A protein has these predicted regions:
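C-terminal capping alpha-helices of c-type cytochrome domains
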Residues: 166-192
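The canonical Cys-X-X-Cys-His
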Residues: 134-145, 176, 180
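Electrostatic cytochrome c docking/interface patches
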Residues: 107-131
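Gly/Gly-Pro-rich "capping" loops immediately C-terminal to redox-active cysteine motifs
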Residues: 143-166
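Sec-dependent N-terminal signal peptides
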Residues: 4-13
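SH3/SH3-like beta-barrel superfamily modules
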Residues: 39-114
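Beta-loop motif signature
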Residues: 19-49, 53-54, 117
Length: 192
């Protein structure tokens, strides 16, 4: 009987809280019915799907927040790799899970809503897409830089300065940026 109850609890937790990744930039909302976006979730960032209601999902997003920048939740506690960014007028509920050292980089969680499409469980596939777009588009004018040639904070401005001379579509730019940042010299998720 004990095994049956534990199995049922495990199954419920797995089905009720699926870990997924955004495939592209997604608008986020304060509740299930709001039509006004309060921010954006960037691609390749993990979310826990808590509930589905109609065409919306309720998401838990964990990350790090610099208390000096209250409208951004970052992927890591040392680099500006954005997970979700809120508008300056938004007032999202952000729960501190663990206080950071010296008043910086608190581990946080926020609950937001988004359209239920555009999520995948295949993070490797998203990184492969970013890598392919980078390799096929960014080595045409110059030698291709290794992803570890720059740190996470440098990649967004470098790519944005050259992206207009590539075939990378606007909707894929953040997939490439997040791939580069998460495989940079200081973050490099493959080495963790």
């Amino acid at each position: 009987m004990k095994k049956l109850v534990l199995s049922a609890l495990l199954a419920c937790s797995l089905f009720g809280a699926d870990m997924m990744y955004s495939e592209g930039v997604k608008d986020v909302y304060a509740d299930a019915t709001s039509t006004k976006s309060i921010g954006r979730l960037l691609p390749t960032n993990a979310v826990k799907i808590l509930q589905t209601s109609g065409d919306r999902v309720k998401l838990a997003v964990q990350g790090y927040q610099n208390p000096a920048v209250p409208n951004v939740v970052y992927f890591s506690d040392f680099a500006r790799v954005i997970a979700v960014a809120f508008s300056k007028t938004a007032n999202p509920e952000i729960k501190v899970l663990q206080k950071g050292k010296d008043g910086k980089w608190d581990k946080v969680e926020t609950i937001v809503y988004a359209s239920k499409d555009g999520f995948t469980s295949d993070l490797k596939g998203l990184f492969n897409k970013g890598e392919t777009l980078y390799k096929e588009s960014c080595g045409v004018c110059h030698g291709l830089h290794a992803t570890t040639h720059y740190n996470a904070n440098q990649w967004p401005s470098l790519l944005k300065s050259m992206v207009n001379r590539t075939a990378i579509q606007k909707e894929d730019q953040w997939v490439v940026i997040e791939y580069l940042q998460k495989h940079s010299s200081d973050v490099n998720v493959d080495k963790k």
